[in-house]
Amino acid sequence: MPKSKFFRVAVEGGTTDGRTITREWIEQMAKRYNQSTYGARVNMEHIRGIDPEGLFKMYGDITAAKTEEVDMEGEKRLALFVQIDPTPELIELNKARQKVYTSVEIHPNLNEKGAYLMGLAVTDSPASLGRSEE
């Protein structure tokens, strides 16, 4: 299965539910992400099902992460971009315009070495602002 292009999943700053994604977290997640350390998977709505045939199975894997400066509401902000290896089911969901947004799962200090990207959910109601529709 071909990997996706890089797309934006988080931007430093506030979220719709009152949390803050820090610039430091964005930098650390991009720098530290390594599938050999912990392979982050793509799930639906932050639910990890136990049945691989059920609705809440995994929909792919994050293969790489990087940062880029973006302009958001006239301000330069640091953003996290990821590349994924999607399953055929995720591609079909996206074609049907379902679960077109993403929501990052962040551990703020994994193994006491800084923030780490633990997963990515596909959703229709993301908390973080400024993501790409993917």
Question: PLM features: what roles do these ranges have?
Answer:
Residues 1-134:
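N-terminal, leucine/charged-rich tether regions that mediate assembly and partner docking
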